């Protein structure tokens, strides 16, 4: 299957630059895997499509303010760090701009020296392994000095950094938000639970690979980035009980979907687990757990639209995207949502 089969025309004006004032007032396109019709709703209508006994799986990761701006020691040259992955307490894999100034042994400082860093080694795709030096708690310094790592297609400054977090975010570790979850409010979640729908939390720390384009012509040759995930015994039990009872499991976002499918057995059960996954889901994949998906509208030729196509079918997905463009849906991280039942 070719990468360019997932291309489509998207006007720049449809790329949402800011979140809506009310999270759940985004539009919702509803699609049935077994029908051709497309229904246009708002996100707060989502309870109409969930039944008592269904299970909603949310990703409770929290985005780190992972962009650091500092200077190179001795020269004072301006530098930007983007934290990618924690290796141990003080050691991280980071992207550095400009990279040519970040040779092994180079030292940098942030916040007038309250945080320092030294390049230890080179990593894949131009990244560096860096050791940080500081007093106190690293996360508190990051909260003080760091900025949110917004996707490259968002060019406007974010007024409130909490709008790039889900209301249920808990465990810090992501370089990007699980954006399907941005539409939920505490009130909407309460309404969903009152209807008898189980809401289960899993964790997958989203990496920047989410935004990396597929650079190969054939999907079979694409290698996904690895991301860390955790599913507790309690979460696995609720999901397995849902399937056993003949009810549906909905993933909130592609990250929740990939976590579920990574932790599934051939017999269609979820096992409690923690580890790294690089699962790549594209048309032809047989889902073992997932029955439905809540997701945003994604980039052309991205692994995310390929995952949606695996569930909905490629032609149906591209047709839905054409309708979304014609109806002027808002796209990408701060955009509107799609529900597949």
Curated annotation (Swiss-Prot):
A GO CC term assigned to this protein in UniProt: cytoplasm
EC number: 2.4.99.17
GO biological process: queuosine biosynthetic process; tRNA wobble guanine modification
SUPFAM superfamilies associated with the record: QueA-like (SSF111337)
InterPro entries: QueA, QueA_dom1, QueA_dom2, QueA_sf
Domain of life: Bacteria
MF term (GO), any: S-adenosylmethionine:tRNA ribosyltransferase-isomerase activity
Keyword terms: Cytoplasm, Queuosine biosynthesis, S-adenosyl-L-methionine, Transferase
Localization: Cytoplasm
One Pfam family cited in the UniProt record for this chain: Queuosine_synth
Reactions it catalyzes: 7-aminomethyl-7-carbaguanosine(34) in tRNA + S-adenosyl-L-methionine = epoxyqueuosine(34) in tRNA + adenine + L-methionine + 2 H(+)
Pathway linked to the protein: tRNA modification; tRNA-queuosine biosynthesis
NCBIfam families according to UniProt: PRK00147.1, queA
Biological function: Transfers and isomerizes the ribose moiety from AdoMet to the 7-aminomethyl group of 7-deazaguanine (preQ1-tRNA) to give epoxyqueuosine (oQ-tRNA).
Family the entry assigns: Belongs to the QueA family.
PANTHER family: S-ADENOSYLMETHIONINE:TRNA RIBOSYLTRANSFERASE-ISOMERASE (PTHR30307:SF0)
Quaternary context: Monomer.
Descriptive protein name: S-adenosylmethionine:tRNA ribosyltransferase-isomerase
High-level lineage: Bacteria, Bacillati, Bacillota, Clostridia, Peptostreptococcales
Gene behind the chain: queA
């Amino acid at each position: 299957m070719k990468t360019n089969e997932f291309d489509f025309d998207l006007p720049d004006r449809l790329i949402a630059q800011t979140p809506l004032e009310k999270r759940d007032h985004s539009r919702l396109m509803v699609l049935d895997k077994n029908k051709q019709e497309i229904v246009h709703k708002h996100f707060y209508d989502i309870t109409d499509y969930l039944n008592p006994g269904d299970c909603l799986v949310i990703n409770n990761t929290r985005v780190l303010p992972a962009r650091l701006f500092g200077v190179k020691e001795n020269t004072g040259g301006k530098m930007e760090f983007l934290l990618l992955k924690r290796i141990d307490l003080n050691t991280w894999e980071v992207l550095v701009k400009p990279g040519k100034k970040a040779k092994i042994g180079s030292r940098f400082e942030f916040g007038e020296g309250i945080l320092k860093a030294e390049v230890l080694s080179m990593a894949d795709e131009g990244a560096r392994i860096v050791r940080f030096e500081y007093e106190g708690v690293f996360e508190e310094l990051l909260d003080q000095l760091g900025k949110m790592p917004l996707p490259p297609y968002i060019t406007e400054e974010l007024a409130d950094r909490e709008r790039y977090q889900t209301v249920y975010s808990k465990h810090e570790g992501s370089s990007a938000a699980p954006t399907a979850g941005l539409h939920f409010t505490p009130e909407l979640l309460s309404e969903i639970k009152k209807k008898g729908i189980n809401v289960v939390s899993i964790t997958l720390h989203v990496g920047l690979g989410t935004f990396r384009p597929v650079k190969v012509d054939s999907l079979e040759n694409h290698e996904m980035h690895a991301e860390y995930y955790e599913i507790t015994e309690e979460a696995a039990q609720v999901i397995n009980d849902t399937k056993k009872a003949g009810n549906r499991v909905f993933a909130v976002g592609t990250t929740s979907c990939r976590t579920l499918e990574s932790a599934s057995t051939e017999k269609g059960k979820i096992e409690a687990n923690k580890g790294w996954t690089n699962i790549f889901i594209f048309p032809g994949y047989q889902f073992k757990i997932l029955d439905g998906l809540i997701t945003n509208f994604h980039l052309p030729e991205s692994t995310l639209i390929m995952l949606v196509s695996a569930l909905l079918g490629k032609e149906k997905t591209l047709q839905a995207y054409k309708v979304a463009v014609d109806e002027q849906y808002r796209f990408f991280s701060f955009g509107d949502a799609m529900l597949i039942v």
